[in-house]
């Protein structure tokens, strides 16, 4: 209806436009509509000529192709629609409604998300000429339906006059600004009648009652409250019979179009709640119910119920026993008791109460013989008068309820273990059930334990009729193995539970049930026994250690599995697993890692890097150790230790129940097998002097993995029988080192190594000369770096030999091969000569190198007299010991100073010829030759006195120390003489003083007189 009124006003506005030029207008957009709901778009044309009834054509431009027109429907051409809309037009889902001759409405009954787009209304021209607009566009946006309305479906039974409250949840999640309206409806029984509106909250947040509920809304009998953002509650204070039927809630979502008109876009209804209303009845009946077995000592509760009364009657109840009133409760809840029962109520033996508006209760907590008889209740409906007193309107009484006490009968006792298990594992809970048969009565129970190999029972626990629990001496205090708990399941069933059992808990358990009787002097008792066994956890504990690869390649990964086998695998007991390691060089096991039963991981500190490359996984009865990047440090013996705890150990600090250690397992970490292969073919290179050459070292295959190579180049001169000399070495870290014989600047510049590719290395030799002739080869080493930073050599291969020859230059050096030998005395000088048989041209220079060799030792370069006259010593210490010079054009001399015994051996020289070559000119070694080996024998010299003295260490020490000893003795003698002379002088002086003292004493008087006279003379002067 809102859409039709909008369209009417829309077209009324458009008719007011002046007629002159054609103008087509459509509803202003954008228009937001929900998926699955209808939409109507109006189109009007004015200022047209021709017939009053104009034709309209509707098209859409979809967002996927905004420039492509998709034809929907036309009032002129039935075949106007494109294929995507043909079926919807035929089914009536899309149609055009003509409002007037120049106005239409495009209807889409059920929107789809693909219907979103820009809609165009076009009017074919009926004018004499084109003047004005012939089409107009508007945007339609299809949004998801997010409206939700829910209410639980239920059936309610109410009495007339009672209140009713129903809650409806309505929510939306639309991105656009929308309003929500909520309406409650009632459908009368039969389903064919139209729903009656009860009350609604409009989109403008205004409460609007339905036509039939206006008066009740004004009287606040019908209300609609919004409890939260999405919660709406319908409240009816006093139900009427006309309210019976099905109630439901309808939520409607509204949106405001650009022309400020509100349009609904979604609408949802909830499930229905069926309401049945019972008419109010003024009359009532009274019944009495008894809840008891009528046994002595048992409680008795009598309930007086009022049936079919009004909604809220004012009732008072009166209790009678054997026709005598014992208690009453008025309508205000005031209690009145007779004297005897007032005393029993004060002692807690009796309770009279009002359970509800229509229920009264009389409760006796412990029945006795005095309580046998007939009970009756009387209920009166009353109303309060103006004076405040209660006026009885009607009175009803219940039938009598007779109470007769039952006599105690013989009982049967059944004892069993919980879950029917008489064999449990250590640490498990042991639970016993003791059930007494017969009539309900207060019972007490006591539990006894007879350990194995004993006959005397031990008291475990007991519970009296009052529920007080007593524990035995050995069970009263929590011990190592747990606690004892006694529980009363019902009046006849008792449970004894011993948690964290130990092996000592095995044996026979006895349950004694007792019942007291007022008419008997002794209590009645019944007994039952059962035997149980507690098995040790350690008895079935087995630990095994295994590995899929006890022999591991270096840097590979290996795993160790510690498997626990026990007969109690289903108990899920906590385990502590300790991994231990004994290195190959030790006899002591060290802790690697400890996974405790409470989840804590403790790492040992024996292997520093072990934690960073180890993964530990642990399940209930299995622990796995995964070690990555194995090194030689991990070589050794492994074992695992398992400790079993009880299930409550997470909350206490009890020691383990059992433990076991696996067998030791040896893990060997070995180097991987080398797959290195080097080209072993030999070759010969013949070169011109002073040219450059390359010697290749080709690798045919290598081992897999992150391995590094070391390349070492060796050289063996042609003219000597010396061992291979190291030229250059490029180690596995790409550091280049020069051999001992190639440290000179000239040789460092001559030889260079290069890594051409991963599998090809070259030795570059610059300016080849005669001294470079010989054989060359390379040695390739494979190195593996372990995680601890240690390099390991996997293998070594040597290449084939490359022989380097020089093309003839016409020059040839010949050194005299005359055999020479000489004996020389120690500490003398000796000269060794090397002679040329012929001398070359004046442009030729010569250099000589002197070598020395001794049996069981390698050759040694002593000195090198270069072609330019410079001397280069093999060792710096030889500079003072020997001298090399050229005595003539054909003679070279090596002179040894102060020959020692160690200088004996073979000496020889190597003479090289040098000439200038190339531009710019450079001295090149063209040819060389060696002399015959010359033998030098050193004889020991004749010993002299100084030499003998120096050669004897004791004599040398004696000659050095003796003067000091004699000097010391002389000083001591002089000191003694001085001391004796001084002592003698002192004695003589003392003798003179004694004599002088006697003379002085004799002449004392005269001396005194003379002194006084002298003093007087001095004063007179």
Swiss-Prot record:
GO cellular component annotations of the record: extracellular exosome; membrane; plasma membrane
Transmembrane domains' residue ranges: 955-975
Gene Ontology terms describing biological process: cell surface receptor signaling pathway; positive regulation of myeloid leukocyte differentiation
Membrane-related topology note: Single-pass type I membrane protein
Pfam families referenced in this protein's UniProt entry, alphabetically: V-set (PF07686)
Domain of life from the UniProt record: Eukaryota
Tissue expression remark: Expressed in lung, thymus and small intestine. Detected in cutaneous dendritic cells, activated T-cells, monocytes and granulocytes as well as with epithelial cells with dendritic morphology. Expressed in some leukemic cells, the CD4(+) CD56(+) blastic tumor cells, as well as in Langerhans cells from LCH (Langerhans cell histiocytosis) patients.
Record carries keyword Nucleus: no
Entry-listed glycosylation sites: 44, 322
PANTHER family found in the cross-reference section: V-SET AND TRANSMEMBRANE DOMAIN-CONTAINING PROTEIN
The name this protein goes by in its record: Immunoglobulin superfamily member 2
Organism whose genome encodes this protein: Homo sapiens (Human)
The organism's taxonomic lineage, starting at the top: Eukaryota, Metazoa, Chordata, Craniata, Vertebrata
The encoding gene: CD101
């Amino acid at each position: 209806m809102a859409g039709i009124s909008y369209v009417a006003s829309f077209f009324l506005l458009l008719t007011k436009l002046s007629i002159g030029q054609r103008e087509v207008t459509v509803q202003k957009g954008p228009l937001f509509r929900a998926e699955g709901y209808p939409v109507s778009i109006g189109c009007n044309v004015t200022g047209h000529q021709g017939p009053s009834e104009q034709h309209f054509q509707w098209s859409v431009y979809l967002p996927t192709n905004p420039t492509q027109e998709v034809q929907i429907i036309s009032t002129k051409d039935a075949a106007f629609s494109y294929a995507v809309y043909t079926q919807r037009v035929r089914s009536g889902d899309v149609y055009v409604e003509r409002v007037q001759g120049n106005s239409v409405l495009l209807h889409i009954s059920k929107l789809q998300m693909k219907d979103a787009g820009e809609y165009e209304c076009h009017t074919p021209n009926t004018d004499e000429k084109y003047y004005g607009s012939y089409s107009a566009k508007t945007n339609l946006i299809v949004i998801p339906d997010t409206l939700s309305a829910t209410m639980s479906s239920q059936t309610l039974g109410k009495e007339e006059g009672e209140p009713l409250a129903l809650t409806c949840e309505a929510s939306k999640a639309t991105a656009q600004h929308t309003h929500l309206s909520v309406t409650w409806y009632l459908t009368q029984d039969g389903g064919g009648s139209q729903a009656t509106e009860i009350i609604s909250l409009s989109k403008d947040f205004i409460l609007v009652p339905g036509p039939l509920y206006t008066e009740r809304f004004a009287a606040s009998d019908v209300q609609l409250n919004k409890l939260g953002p999405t919660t709406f509650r319908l409240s009816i204070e006093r139900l009427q019979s006309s309210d019976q039927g099905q109630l439901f809630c309808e939520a409607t979502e509204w949106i405001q179009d650009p022309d400020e008109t509100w349009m609904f876009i979604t609408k949802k209804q909830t499930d229905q709640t069926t309401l049945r209303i019972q008419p109010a009845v003024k009359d009532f009946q009274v019944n009495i119910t008894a809840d008891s077995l009528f046994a002595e000592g048992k409680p008795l509760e009598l309930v007086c119920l009022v049936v079919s009364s009004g909604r809220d009657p004012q009732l008072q109840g009166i209790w009678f026993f054997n026709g005598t009133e014992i208690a009453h409760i008025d309508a205000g809840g005031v209690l009145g008791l007779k004297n005897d029962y007032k005393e029993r109520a004060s002692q807690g033996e009796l309770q009279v109460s009002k359970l509800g508006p229509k229920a009264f209760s009389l409760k006796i907590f412990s029945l006795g013989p005095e309580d046998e008889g007939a009970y009756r209740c009387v209920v009166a409906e009353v109303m309060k008068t103006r004076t405040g007193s209660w006026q009885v309107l009607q009175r009803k009484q219940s039938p009598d309820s007779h109470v007769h006490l039952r006599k105690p009968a013989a009982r049967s006792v059944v004892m069993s273990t919980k879950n029917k298990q008489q064999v449990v594992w250590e640490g498990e809970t042991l639970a016993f059930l003791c059930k007494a048969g017969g009539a309900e009565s207060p019972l007490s129970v006591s539990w006894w334990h007879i350990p194995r190999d004993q006959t005397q029972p031990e008291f475990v626990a007991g519970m009296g009729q009052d529920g007080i629990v007593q524990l035995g001496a050995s069970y009263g205090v929590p011990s190592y193995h747990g606690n004892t708990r006694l529980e009363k399941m019902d009046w006849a069933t008792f449970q004894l539970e011993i948690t964290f059992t130990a092996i000592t808990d095995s044996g026979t358990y006895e349950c004694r049930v007792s019942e007291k009787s007022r008419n008997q002097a002794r209590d009645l008792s019944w007994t039952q026994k059962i035997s149980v066994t507690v098995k040790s956890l350690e008895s079935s504990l087995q630990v095994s250690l295994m590995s899929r690869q006890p022999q591991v390649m270096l840097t590979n990964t290996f795993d160790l599995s510690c498997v626990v086998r026990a007969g109690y695998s289903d108990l899920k007991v906590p385990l502590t697993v300790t991994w231990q390691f004994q290195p190959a060089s030790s006899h002591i096991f060290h802790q690697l890692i400890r996974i405790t039963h409470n989840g804590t991981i403790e790492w040992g500190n024996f292997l520093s890097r072990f934690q960073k490359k180890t993964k530990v996984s642990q399940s209930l009865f299995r622990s796995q150790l995964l070690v990555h990047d194995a090194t030689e440090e991990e070589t050794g013996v492994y074992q695992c230790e398992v400790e079993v705890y009880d299930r409550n150990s997470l909350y206490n600090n009890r020691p383990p129940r059992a433990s076991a250690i696996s067998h030791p397992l040896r893990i060997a970490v070995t180097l991987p097998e080398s797959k290195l292969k080097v080209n072993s073919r030999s070759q010969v290179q013949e070169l011109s002097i002073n040219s450059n050459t390359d010697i290749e070292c080709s690798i045919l295959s290598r081992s897999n993995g992150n391995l590094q190579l070391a390349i070492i180049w060796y050289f063996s001169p042609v003219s000597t029988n010396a061992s291979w000399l190291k030229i250059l070495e490029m180690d596995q870290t790409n550091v280049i080192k020069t051999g001992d014989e190639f440290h000179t600047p000239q040789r460092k510049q001559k030889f260079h190594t290069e890594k051409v590719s991963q599998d090809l290395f070259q030795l570059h030799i610059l300016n080849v000369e005669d001294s470079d002739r010989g054989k060359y080869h390379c040695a390739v080493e494979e190195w593996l770096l372990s995680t601890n930073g240690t390099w390991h050599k996997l293998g070594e291969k040597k290449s084939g030999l490359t022989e380097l020859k020089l093309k003839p230059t016409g020059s040839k050096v010949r050194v005299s091969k005359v055999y020479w030998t000489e004996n020389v005395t120690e500490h003398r000088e000796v000269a060794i000569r090397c002679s040329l048989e012929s001398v070359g041209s004046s442009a030729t220079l010569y250099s000589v190198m002197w070598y020395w060799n001794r049996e069981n030792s390698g050759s040694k370069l002593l000195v090198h007299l270069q072609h330019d006259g410079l001397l280069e010593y093999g060792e710096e210490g030889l500079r003072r010991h020997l001298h090399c010079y050229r005595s003539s054009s054909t003679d070279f001399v090596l002179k040894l100073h102060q020959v020692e015994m160690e200088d004996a051996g073979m000496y020889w020289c190597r003479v090289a010829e040098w000439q200038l070559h190339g531009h710019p000119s450079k001295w090149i070694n063209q040819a060389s030759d060696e002399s015959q080996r010359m033998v030098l024998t050193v004889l020991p010299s004749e010993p002299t006195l100084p030499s003998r003295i120096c050669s004897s260490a004791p004599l040398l020490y004696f000659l050095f120390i003796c003067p000091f000893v004699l000097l010391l003795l002389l000083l001591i003698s002089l000191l003694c003489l001085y001391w004796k002379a001084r002592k003698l002088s002192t004695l003589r002086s003392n003798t003179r003083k004694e004599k002088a003292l006697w003379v002085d004493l004799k002449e004392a008087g005269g001396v005194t007189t003379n002194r006084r006279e002298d003093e007087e003379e001095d004063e007179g002067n």
